[in-house]
């Protein structure tokens, strides 16, 4: 059974245009000086998400306890009020539990589709696309969030993704400031910190920041 997200555009079209503004979209490319980001103006719609599930399998409520976490990738979840898509799939129960927090604390949120942000990171000779777990809007910020097993936080791939996303958020924030929009923050969140007693603001301590590179001194 194939679910599509076309129907959300009639309901949320104007809101999507507001949230998914072009300061959110950037392209990374590698130069001698490192990663550079170009952010253009304009608007873009959310990418259409297609979900495949077994015939006859209903969507589960996102707050329902998952008794078989190993099967969660095969499951479809609904019952959202603040998600920009009516249905979502999760790669882990940690993601589902984080979505519960977003439903409570965020203004709006969604799980980006491939190609939505076009963030690329360097891993050896490859430059794969990085797709973060969540993007959420709050009163003060727009948060890009990755939830990850604590044991994997310091791996080369996770750190490369975090560095690319943090730099993307810094450039997006610079552009947002020029047009009066909210700044972006990238959060790399350990899985064992995702508990319902936490508030979304509590996760700001896991922010990964990209600092502007100092200019090289010029010789006379």
Describe each model-derived feature in a short phrase.
Residues 1-128, 137-143, 148-220:
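Intrinsically disordered, low-complexity, repeat-rich regions
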Residues 134:
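Phosphate/adenylate-binding glycine loop and adjacent helical scaffold
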Residues 131:
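Active-site lining segments that contact anionic ligands and/or coordinate catalytic metals
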């Amino acid at each position: 059974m194939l679910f599509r997200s076309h129907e959300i555009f009639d309901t949320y079209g104007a809101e999507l245009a507001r949230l998914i503004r072009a300061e959110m979209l950037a392209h990374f490319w590698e130069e001698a000086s490192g990663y550079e980001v170009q952010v253009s103006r304009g608007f873009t719609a959310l990418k259409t998400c297609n979900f495949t599930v077994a015939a006859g399998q209903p969507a589960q409520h996102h707050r329902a306890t998952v008794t078989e976490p190993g099967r969660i990738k095969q499951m479809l979840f609904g019952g959202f009020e603040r998600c920009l898509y009516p249905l979502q799939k999760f790669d882990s129960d940690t993601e589902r539990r984080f979505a519960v927090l977003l439903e409570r604390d965020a203004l709006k949120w969604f799980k980006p589709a491939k190609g939505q942000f076009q963030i690329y990171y360097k891993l050896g000779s490859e430059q794969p696309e990085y797709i973060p777990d969540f993007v959420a809007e709050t009163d003060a910020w727009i948060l890009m969030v990755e939830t990850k097993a604590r044991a994997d936080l310091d791996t080369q791939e996770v750190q490369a993704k975090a560095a690319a996303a943090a730099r993307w958020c810094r450039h997006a924030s610079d552009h947002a400031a020029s047009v009066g929009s909210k700044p972006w923050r990238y959060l790399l969140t350990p899985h064992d910190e995702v508990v319902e007693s936490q508030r979304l603001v509590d996760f700001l301590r896991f922010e990964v920041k990209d600092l502007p590179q100092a200019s090289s001194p010029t010789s006379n």
